[in-house]
């Protein structure tokens, strides 16, 4: 498959490409990894149940703490009996709340209309047809140096072909049409893998959920910090114990998160490698390294553009055209910065915990 550059981008596609063969062993491996990722949240739930059982056991079996105590010792005995139960209850609460709390809202995107952008929609349909992937129901724009194809309604679209394509405007502004076509072929290459993409969605969802549980903080964390500063030493001790329990619990979850990441990394790299093959087949193997370099440069320029935006925001101003600012920043990158990025790319080797080859 080749992409030339005639008058119409739709005429640029000539020939066809051979679908990348996904070995049966690889698909079976993805299933095993997905099963392991599903088991990790069950370990999380088991931790909640175990902590609940310990609190119940303490309340039922440690009533002797309150027997044969008099005077001021009653206060100490009460704290020794009630304190662990309160601390354990708070610990359980902090483990349960992530099951029901929603994550941070995704950055807003702009939905395109096929009636207003027929050429772009036809361009995407052409790529999907060549790659052998389902056509997305929606195309959206954002300001990232990236493109992504995913389930439009998350889990509700899991068993169908209800997809959404998100194209970053800096990507479109800073790349050639051939390069953009290659990037889109990479994204749709994931969905050409069928079951593999769904296994991957399970894996990434579980990994993302664990990361959110471990690192996100909310107003309950702030309240616990405040309670741990209580003036009464007894109350302070209870909430410090609870705070310590929450810290230990998050460390356990951190271990589960990294276990899931380690389990899934090899399969993730293989999926990305297969998707890369679609990009190389559609845009050309000679264009692939140029696209990768362009992505690195635009990503660095995006960081500089966001710093510019932050500075202007201090004066209650914002850039009029962020994609153009990113492209300008890329064009004016110092030679030393370009060389540094290129050297880093050539010298970096794939590590065991990398998700991309």
Where are these regions (language model features)?
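Cytosolic-facing loops and C-terminal tails of multi-pass membrane proteins
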Residues: 2-25, 226-268, 273-277, 281, ...
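Amphipathic alpha-helical transducer elements in NTP-driven molecular machines
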Residues: 117-121, 177, 181, 272, ...
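Secretory-pathway/luminal and periplasmic proteins that interact with or process carbohydrate-rich
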Residues: 148-149, 211-218, 299-305
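Post-HExxH zinc-binding segment in Zn-dependent metallohydrolases
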Residues: 196, 203-235, 279
């Amino acid at each position: 498959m080749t992409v030339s550059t005639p008058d119409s981008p739709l005429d640029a596609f000539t020939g066809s490409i051979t679908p990348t063969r996904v070995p049966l062993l690889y698909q079976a491996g993805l299933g095993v990894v997905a099963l392991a990722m599903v088991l990790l949240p069950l370990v999380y739930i088991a931790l909640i149940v175990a902590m609940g059982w310990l609190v119940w056991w303490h309340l039922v079996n440690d009533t002797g703490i309150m027997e044969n105590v008099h005077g001021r010792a009653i206060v100490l005995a009460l704290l020794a009996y009630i304190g662990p139960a309160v601390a354990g209850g708070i610990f359980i609460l902090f483990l349960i709340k992530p099951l029901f709390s929603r994550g941070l809202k995704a950055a807003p995107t702009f939905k395109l209309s096929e009636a207003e952008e027929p050429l772009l929609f036809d361009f995407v349909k052409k790529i999907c047809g060549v790659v052998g992937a389902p056509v997305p129901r929606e195309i959206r724009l954002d300001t990232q140096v990236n493109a992504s194809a995913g389930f439009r309604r998350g889990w509700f679209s899991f068993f169908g072909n209800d997809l959404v394509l998100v194209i970053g405007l800096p990507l479109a502004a800073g790349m050639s049409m051939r390069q953009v076509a290659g990037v889109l072929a990479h994204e749709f290459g994931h969905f050409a893998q069928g079951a593999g993409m769904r296994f991957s969605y399970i894996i990434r969802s579980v990994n993302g959920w664990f990361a959110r549980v471990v690192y996100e903080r909310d107003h309950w964390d702030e309240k616990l910090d405040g309670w741990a500063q209580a003036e009464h030493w007894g109350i302070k001790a209870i909430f410090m114990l609870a705070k310590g329990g929450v810290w230990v619990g998050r460390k356990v979850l951190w271990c589960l998160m990294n276990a899931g990441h380690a389990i899934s990394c090899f399969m993730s790299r293989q999926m990305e490698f297969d998707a890369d093959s679609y990009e190389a087949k559609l845009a050309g193997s000679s264009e692939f390294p140029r696209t990768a370099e362009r992505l690195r440069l635009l990503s660095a320029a995006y960081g500089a553009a966001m710093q510019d935006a932050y500075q202007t925001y201090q004066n209650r101003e914002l850039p009029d055209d962020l994609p153009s600012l990113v492209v300008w920043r890329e064009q004016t990158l110092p030679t030393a910065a370009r060389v540094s990025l290129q050297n880093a790319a050539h010298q970096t080797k794939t590590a065991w915990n990398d998700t991309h080859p």
